Amino acid sequence: MGEVRRPDRVAEAIREEVATFLSEGAKDPRIRAFVTVTAVEVTRDLRHATVFVSLMGDDADKKSTTAGLASVASHLRSQLGKSLRLRSAPEIHFRTDESVARASRIEHLLAKIRDEREAQEPAQDPAQDSSQDASVEASDAPDKAE
């Protein structure tokens, strides 16, 4: 199993710190959408960190939040330098992660297809099912006249 690479450990620590910062300390009024930190990737030299975020809200809120996140990146970088005790805190780059929205859309489409199929299938009467089962059992029974 080998040890975990240092950039991976730093990325996980950054993910936790950014999530805490956004839920408790982000004072930018442009950050109006619900923000979830989905992942963080850090370069080997620890100079750059790409923070992937999922944004929930309408398009205007998402656009505003994206601008707000870019604005707080430098403040967040200084906070990370203090809390993670790194010689040089990585430069923060925010990227929108569309995978959560895409997965939600796919789930919605699958549910719609399932509902349409259920609506198209004729509802079978349970009494008909039992009479059909009885006739099948009678035809499968061996002849006793032999």
UniProtKB/Swiss-Prot annotation:
<dbReference type="InterPro" id="IPR000238">
    <property type="entry name" value="RbfA"/>
</dbReference>
<feature type="region of interest" description="Disordered">
    <location>
        <begin position="113"/>
        <end position="146"/>
    </location>
</feature>
<keyword id="KW-0690">Ribosome biogenesis</keyword>
<protein>
    <recommendedName>
        <fullName>Ribosome-binding factor A</fullName>
    </recommendedName>
</protein>
<comment type="similarity">
    <text>Belongs to the RbfA family.</text>
</comment>
<dbReference type="GO" id="GO:0043024">
    <property type="term" value="F:ribosomal small subunit binding"/>
</dbReference>
<dbReference type="GO" id="GO:0005829">
    <property type="term" value="C:cytosol"/>
</dbReference>
<dbReference type="InterPro" id="IPR023799">
    <property type="entry name" value="RbfA_dom_sf"/>
</dbReference>
<dbReference type="GO" id="GO:0030490">
    <property type="term" value="P:maturation of SSU-rRNA"/>
</dbReference>
<dbReference type="Pfam" id="PF02033">
    <property type="entry name" value="RBFA"/>
</dbReference>
<keyword id="KW-0963">Cytoplasm</keyword>
<dbReference type="InterPro" id="IPR020053">
    <property type="entry name" value="Ribosome-bd_factorA_CS"/>
</dbReference>
<comment type="subunit">
    <text>Monomer. Binds 30S ribosomal subunits, but not 50S ribosomal subunits or 70S ribosomes.</text>
</comment>
<comment type="function">
    <text>One of several proteins that assist in the late maturation steps of the functional core of the 30S ribosomal subunit. Associates with free 30S ribosomal subunits (but not with 30S subunits that are part of 70S ribosomes or polysomes). Required for efficient processing of 16S rRNA. May interact with the 5'-terminal helix region of 16S rRNA.</text>
</comment>
<dbReference type="InterPro" id="IPR015946">
    <property type="entry name" value="KH_dom-like_a/b"/>
</dbReference>
